[in-house]
């Protein structure tokens, strides 16, 4: 059976990442940062900045293996998240149609920026 082609906005289907546990991807974010000389603490700082979670919230989500969908449903997203722009996986994050996929791409983008050596102050956007 053939699948319909994926669209840039992902609005037409439930993407597999939505049901993937945040805890299963989190170590990949940390590993990516550490390979480039950055730290787990910096990854945590960015996750906390984006989600407006407390550290205890992050630890709970990791322990409970909540899905990305649940993770972002509970996250009071940082009001400056919409200032995150750029391309992840060939898609401009500011043009992603599905709100959940856009939040996931925001996270991917700021972790990419961290791994590329961008200063924390620049990654954590301010108007």
List where the protein language model places each region:
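A charge-rich, low-complexity, intrinsically flexible signal that marks solvent-exposed coils, linkers
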Residues: 9-127
């Amino acid at each position: 059976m053939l699948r319909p082609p994926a669209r840039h906005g992902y609005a037409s289907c439930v993407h597999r990442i939505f049901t993937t546990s945040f805890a299963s991807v989190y170590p990949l974010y940390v590993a990516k940062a550490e390979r480039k000389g950055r730290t787990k603490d910096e990854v945590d700082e960015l996750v906390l900045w984006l989600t407006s979670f407390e550290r205890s919230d992050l630890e709970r989500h990791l322990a409970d293996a909540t899905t990305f969908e649940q993770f972002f449903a509970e996250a009071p997203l940082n009001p400056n998240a919409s200032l995150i722009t750029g391309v992840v996986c060939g898609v401009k994050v500011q043009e992603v149609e599905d709100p959940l996929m856009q939040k996931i791409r925001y996270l991917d983008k700021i972790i990419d920026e961290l791994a590329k050596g961008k200063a924390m102050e620049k990654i954590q956007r301010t108007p």
